[in-house]
A protein has these predicted regions:
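ATP/NTP phosphate-donor binding region
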Residues: 1-64
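Glycine/threonine-rich beta-strand-loop-alpha-helix active-site module
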Residues: 48-55, 59-150
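Carboxylate- and glycine-rich phosphate/diphosphate-binding segment that chelates Mg2+/Mn2+
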Residues: 122-230
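Catalytic phosphate/nucleotide-handling subdomain of diverse soluble enzymes
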Residues: 241-275
């Protein structure tokens, strides 16, 4: 389907430097689609970046959006869409509100395996005036098209691979242990967690491992579908303020909190955590639920803090 005649491509400088942008723009040109590029998205997106992107969209008479890059460009494209159709001056005016007005058509092309923003109804933007990280949500924020091609993740550095992979793991574990979990989200969550346990260390050690990169891209996609339906829990609730106040990348703040927050939640969901322990193979069927649950948390620690050497809250 044709989304429009002129696109605003929301991205970061890394996509241009790595040569990925040419692959996208060549296809647009071959199909007679005009475009302008907003490549100012860096780090955690802010309300200022969103306002600048919205101005570029309207000044150039664009009629659809392409988010191309990691979670930040994808989230930014969603927020720009909200701003250009909402009639307000700053995206922070939407803080705490459910977005219901349709945004322009959005295609999402992730270059990391983490946020799952290509399929979610969420966008996280920093409010620079109030020093908070806003979470905006609404079904209208789900991209019309998601193009998940692991080739775009092959050049991600180890630090990004680790941080984004732990974000996907956090999504899946929190979705599975959420009170809003459903049989459908359970299937996607278990599938994502098993992939991440197996393939994230491999993708981290060898970024050119095609099988590992593909598996991680699918896992992030699956975990994104999960949180659309069963949401997240304590880790994300605590990590957003850390990101806003100390400008810590989202995946890193999740990793810092992951074991401590899940340990706190463990006693209320031994059976759920035990199932994850057995499904990932770190616990056996002869283990009690309590033992299997603790073994699962030990497995998370092995992946997060041993294989990937990510920081803990301590």
């Amino acid at each position: 389907c044709k989304l429009g005649k002129k696109a605003l491509i929301v991205t970061g400088q890394s996509m241009i430097k790595q040569g990925h942008m040419a692959a996208l723009t060549d296809i647009l040109e071959d199909n007679g689609i005009e475009y302008v590029i907003d490549s100012k998205i860096s780090g955690e997106p802010t309300d200022v970046m969103i306002s600048e992107g919205a101005k570029m969209y309207t000044d150039n008479n664009c009629d659809f959006l392409i988010g191309f890059g990691g979670g930040s460009p994808l989230d930014s494209a969603k927020a720009i869409g909200v701003l250009v159709t909402g009639g307000v001056e700053n995206i922070s005016d939407y803080n705490g509100k459910f977005i219901t007005k349709p945004i322009p058509p959005l295609a999402a092309i992730p270059s990391t395996a983490g946020t799952g923003s290509e399929v979610t109804k969420f966008t996280a933007i920093a409010d620079t005036r109030n020093q908070i990280k806003m979470l905006l949500k609404g079904d209208v924020l789900i991209p019309v098209i998601a193009i998940v091609d692991s080739q775009f993740t092959m050049n991600a550095p180890k630090s990004v691979t680790a941080a984004t992979g732990l974000d996907a793991l956090t999504h899946a574990v929190e979705a599975y242990t959420s009170r809003l979990a459903t049989p459908q989200t359970d299937l996607y969550a278990i599938s994502a967690i098993k992939k991440i346990f197996k393939y994230l260390p491999k993708a981290y050690m060898d970024g050119k491992d095609i099988e590992a990169r593909e598996a991680m891209s699918v896992a992030a996609y699956e975990a994104g579908i999960c949180i659309n339906n069963s949401s997240v829990t304590l880790v994300h609730g605590m990590s957003r303020p850390i990101g806003a106040l100390f400008h810590v990348p989202h995946g890193i703040s999740n990793a810092m909190l992951l074991k401590s927050c899940l340990s706190y939640a463990l006693s209320g969901a031994y059976e759920r955590f035990a199932i994850l322990g057995r499904e990932t193979g770190v616990a056996s069927h002869i283990d009690s639920d309590e033992t299997a649950a603790h073994k699962f948390l030990d497995g998370i620690s092995a992946v997060s803090y041993t294989h990937l050497t990510l920081p803990t809250i301590a």
